[in-house]
Regions:
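Glycine- and acidic/polar-rich repeat regions and solenoidal domains
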Residues: 51-53, 78-83, 97-120, 127-397
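Beta-solenoid repeat scaffold
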Residues: 32-75, 82-93, 115-120
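Short N-terminal segments immediately surrounding and downstream of signal-peptide cleavage
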Residues: 18-30
Length: 425
């Protein structure tokens, strides 16, 4: 028995073959013919107007790797696009820059409608547009996630100016979700001036009742100022954890769907105009241990906002807020700390119901209330909350302690180069 265990422990690790290619057709064939554990190297240089389709099947223990010869030096330009299909592929070190000429996504986790990517990973890559770059398309998206159990991590994504969400998770019968987006740097995106400019959207109205079970964690969103919804949740059972939002003129919005968790996120407005926090719509959400500081937004961009619902709402309307747990959050020096029962839609007449506020701390600005109410909430539970100011529009709550000397430790802005691809730091 000991001899058998020793043999297993010291068994040699078998490495796959490595093949270097310099054009899209050679890359396509190399990935198609690759065996689990093989590595395909894409030569450094300008891969202009390249439609690169990478379709292959590795295994969990031996994925097929497609990487840049030198991280960041294999650059796709012009009318290029990248598509992945199959399973257990890892793509790393590529730079998609100033792409134009195609209305299709820059990067898709599918070859076509019949061949999706599952259990694939794009890591240490960049998708960027220079400040002076003018795309020819009026509308497009940059990244589309399809299939299931894919990863997008340690990437830099910035500079989109045209209409269209930057990153979309698509859901459906063949696209159940369960994706993991982490350690990405979502850089500046200028104001669009209309809807359709989200940085990240998971689902849409039609798929909003699906359990997507996506995990979005430890990403940086910096100056993503495209529209009110920086992150737009439109599905159920997603988790947004430990992300950092710096000077974002928008919010993490639970727009459609139920049972999502928003926890341990950091929102730093740095007194930039219209910077926002968390907007809640729907049922059974949990807003836990978030820190929101120096935000200048109001209305939908309030630090934490609970929205009024529309009776018998359609899927793309406003469902009533029900049974939300708001616990352990800190709000420091925000223009508006918490807003209950708000909506700018006249037919939204259903107030939040069944909400539990527990162990939250609020330090409001001088002369500002801790909590503002537009439409009185129903059946709220208040436990061990503390604020330096009184609320407005609410009766006295034994579970909301007034402490004019309450202090909350402020957070400093983290280093921006701690996120994204290693070769861009």
């Amino acid at each position: 028995m000991k001899a058998t265990l020793a043999a297993l422990f010291f068994a040699p690790i078998l490495h796959g073959a490595t093949l270097t290619v310099s054009d899209p057709e050679a890359a396509r064939k190399a990935v198609r013919d690759a065996k689990p554990g093989d590595t395909i190297v894409l030569t450094a240089g300008d891969w202009k107007d390249t439609d690169l389709r990478l379709d292959g099947d590795g295994t969990e223990s031996a994925p097929i790797t497609i990487r840049a010869e030198v991280p960041g030096k294999t650059v796709f330009t012009g009318a290029s696009r990248l598509r992945l299909g199959g399973s257990h592929l890892i793509v790393s070190g590529l730079h998609l820059h100033n792409l134009s000429g195609s209305k299709a996504d820059w990067l898709e986790f599918r070859i076509d409608s019949k061949r999706r990517a599952n259990h694939c990973r794009v890591t240490d890559c960049a998708l960027t547009a220079a400040p002076d770059f003018k795309a020819t398309e009026k509308e497009n998206r940059w990244i589309g996630l399809y299939g299931t159990s894919n990863q997008l991590d340690h990437c830099r994504i910035e500079g989109k100016k045209t209409k269209g969400t930057t990153v979309v998770v698509w859901l459906g019968e063949d696209d159940p979700g369960n994706h993991h987006l982490h350690h990405n740097h979502f850089g500046p995106r200028p104001e669009l001036g209309k809807n359709g400019g989200e940085t990240l959207r998971i689902g849409d109205s039609n798929s909003s009742m699906m359990d997507a079970r996506c995990l979005v964690e430890e990403n940086l969103f910096h100056a993503c100022n495209c529209e009110t919804e920086c992150v737009s949740n439109k599905s159920c059972s997603n988790t947004y954890r430990a992300n950092t939002f710096i000077e974002v003129e928008g919010t993490l919005t639970l727009r459609h769907g139920n049972r999502c968790i928003v926890e341990k996120n950091l929102f730093l407005g740095n007194h930039k105009t219209r910077t926002g926090g968390i907007r809640v719509i729907g049922e059974d959400h949990q807003i836990l241990d978030n820190h929101l500081q120096d935000l200048e937004g109001d209305g939908f961009r309030t630090a934490i906002t609970l929205i009024n619902g529309i009776p018998d709402s359609v899927l793309n309307g406003y469902f009533q807020v029900k049974n939300t747990l708001i616990r352990g959050n800190t709000m420091l020096n925000c223009k508006h700390s918490m807003l209950l029962g708000y909506n700018d839609v006249k037919k939204a007449t259903l107030p939040p119901i069944g909400t539990r506020l527990e162990r939250n701390r609020i330090v409001a600005r001088p002369g500002q209330p801790a909590i503002e109410t537009k439409l009185a909430p129903e059946t709220f539970t208040w436990i061990d909350n503390e604020a330096n100011a009184e609320p407005t529009g609410l009766p006295t709550q034994s579970g909301l302690k007034h402490n004019s000397d309450l202090a909350i430790k402020s957070h400093s802005t983290p280093a921006l180069d701690a996120f994204g691809p290693s070769w861009m730091r």
